[in-house]
């Protein structure tokens, strides 16, 4: 695993160089954007190595993998605290696994999904499993491809207005 850790450290440094250079070219401060390590397809040991290499913000695209990673990482109290987000399609039957585990859900593209998240968040908040409204990004389908998720750009304002009425979610931005 030492070789993997060395590889992770070196790769992270290369990525950060390019990341900061892009921010510099855009005239933005280095803290204006976040580097998110997508940990899908790797196990808990590899995620531990990524944390040891300096990554602190992760994302998963499957709720069961998110829960598995968090459970596995709980066995490593020596590690610094990290953040996990949920990316990718979220089915309503998987919402409970994500609430209280993911700090941000990146893929809310419909009123139906947002309502389901908001209503289930109430129960999680009452049970002390969620500290407040679930933070979400609205997924916008800018390509117009039917195979892609998200709201059409011409329906975005309407969806934002509808989601703003839901008291147990907080819109934090857009995901395209």
Label each PLM-derived region with a short phrase:
Residues 1-176:
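Conserved alpha/beta-domain cores
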